UniProtKB/Swiss-Prot annotation:
Classification via Pfam families: Response_reg, Trans_reg_C
UniProt subcellular location: Cytoplasm
Gene3D superfamilies referenced in this protein's UniProt entry, alphabetically: 3.40.50.2300, 6.10.250.690, Winged helix-like DNA-binding domain superfamily/Winged helix DNA-binding domain
GO biological process, one term: regulation of DNA-templated transcription
The name this protein goes by in its record: Transcriptional regulatory protein SrrA
């Protein structure tokens, strides 16, 4: 696994600050000050993570993430001074895995990066070890964890890495209710710095993508009002034998 991180921000002060803190954790840092440069570097290199500012010259962060997701699944943490829900949703829609609003603590950014990489590395190790075929099957939904592929009514659904991890986590324990704090801790590995709206935004996007090809698959992700979410499996939706 690479220890190289790409920091993309048009403010030199922010790049220097993040570089200093991340280098203390033994990461190798690369920098870009505009969107076009960031996209070219990301395509040429296999970074462990990209810290991507939303407002950039030449090509903004949304455009960079959207174009990059057509070719790569490099983990992306979006950095922005805008905290409104619309901007957060746009960031996640473009393929970002996380979202941090400026002004932020550099230590928080380091913790977010480490949490994201722990999850990514854990998934890579699990997939590389010899094991029986890891597939979760329901009447309207199939999750092939070996191929990292989701089928809803036999049609492939293109999910971001974090949307996929969230779906897997819920589907592995059908009908169990998880509150938002649990999901932040287990899927995002946040205990102190997580924004609960991150969970809501990812669930919304996951449902929308599933619903495009199968309303039945989308309806399996249920909101438990005042608590959180569950992956609902009824008797006629039991995993295929």
């Amino acid at each position: 696994m690479s220890n190289e991180i790409l920091i993309v921000d048009d403010e030199d002060r922010i790049r220097r600050l993040l570089k200093m803190y991340l280098e203390r954790e033994s990461f190798e840092i690369h920098e870009a000050s505009n969107g076009q440069e960031a996209y070219e570097l990301a395509m040429e290199n296999n970074y462990a993570c990209i810290l991507l500012d939303l407002m950039l010259p030449e090509m903004d962060g949304i455009q960079v993430a959207t174009k990059l997701r057509e070719h790569k699944q490099t983990p992306i943490i979006m950095l922005t001074a805008k905290g409104e829900e619309t901007n957060r949703v746009e960031g996640f829609e473009s393929g970002a895995d996380d979202y941090i609003v400026k002004p932020f603590s550099p230590r928080e950014v380091v913790l977010r990066v480490k949490a994201l990489l722990r999850r990514t590395q854990s998934t890579t190790v699990e997939q590389s070890e010899p094991h029986a075929r890891d597939v979760i099957e329901f009447k309207h939904l199939e999750i092939d964890n070996d191929a990292h592929r989701v089928l809803a009514d036999n049609q492939e659904v293109n999910l971001t890495p974090k949307e996929y991890e969230l779906l897997i986590y819920l589907a592995k324990t059908p009908n169990k209710v998880f509150d938002r704090e649990q999901l932040l801790k287990e899927v995002w590995h946040y205990e102190f710095y997580g924004d609960l709206r991150t969970v809501d935004t990812h669930v919304k996007r996951l449902r929308e993508k599933l619903n495009r090809v199968s309303s039945e698959a989308a309806h399996m992700i249920q909101t438990v009002w005042g608590v959180g979410y569950k992956f609902e499996v009824k008797s006629n939706d039991e995993p295929a034998k």
